[in-house]
Amino acid sequence: MPKLSVCIEMFWTDLPFDERIRRVAAAGYSAYEFWGWRAKDLDAIRAATAETGLAVAGFAIDPGFALTAPGGEEGMTKAAVEAAGVAHSLNCKSLIVTTGNEIAGESFEITRRRVVRKLKAMSAVAADEGLRICLEPLNPFVDHKHYWLTTMAQAGDIVEEVDSAGLGILYDLYHQQLTEGKLINNLHRHLHQIGHIHTAGVPGRHELLGSENDYAALFRAIDASGYNGYVGLEFRPTIGEEAALAQTLTLLG
């Protein structure tokens, strides 16, 4: 059975983050994740995590710089060091990074060299700290127009070139269905590189049940593949948070 994690950025959005953590536990889940850490009350988050016994599946490095943008190498590496400190305080092993948008007038290959250079430095930090950065391709059609990294093949090639235990892929089944499909094929092709998985219904980014993505089948495929990382629920509930989370559990069989 896949290990599920609730993205608290998209659930109970009217509540403080520490209370959202308590709601995750009350809903019967054992892990949560979030996006950026810099603007959050980390003391309250640590206290709620200790109180509930939940695992922290991952969070974003929150560098303040884009991997694609010229410059910022020192800032990106510093951000990785800072995020590693936060990760250790939360007993979290996975960090998330996105690339940023295309650079106008610049070829894909020139941007790619810059991204690889920055990721080599950041992943060296992660590897030294016993962590793994998960690089996330996103869809450029609905949610992230002009985003640079869009396919699993692109992400896989970068991870292969960087060649570090500190770098893997965040496989988002919502984004990749919109971008390229072939979800189970890509799961198997990149299984050795995948460090985290995200889910949401297609279209709309809502509940998993009734989605264009057959999540019951996808969960079976993930389970059968031997993947042992977390599967994050990164969707906006339309039927109420507790109902949506209970409904998701029915897809596990």
Task: Tell where the protein language model's regions lie, with residue ranges.
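Histidine-acidic metal/acid-base catalytic patches
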Residues: 1-28, 91-93, 149-171, 175-253
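A short beta-strand-loop structural module common to alpha/beta enzyme folds
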Residues: 30-39
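Active-site-adjacent beta->alpha loops and helix N-cap segments on the catalytic face
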Residues: 38-50, 105
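Flexible loop residues that form catalytic
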Residues: 37, 100, 138, 202, ...
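N-terminal small/glycine-rich loop or linker at the start of catalytic domains
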Residues: 1-10, 56-67, 99-103, 142
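Conserved beta-strand positions in the central sheet of alpha/beta enzyme cores
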Residues: 33, 58-60, 96, 134, ...
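Active-site acidic/histidine proton-transfer and metal-coordination neighborhood
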Residues: 66-168, 178
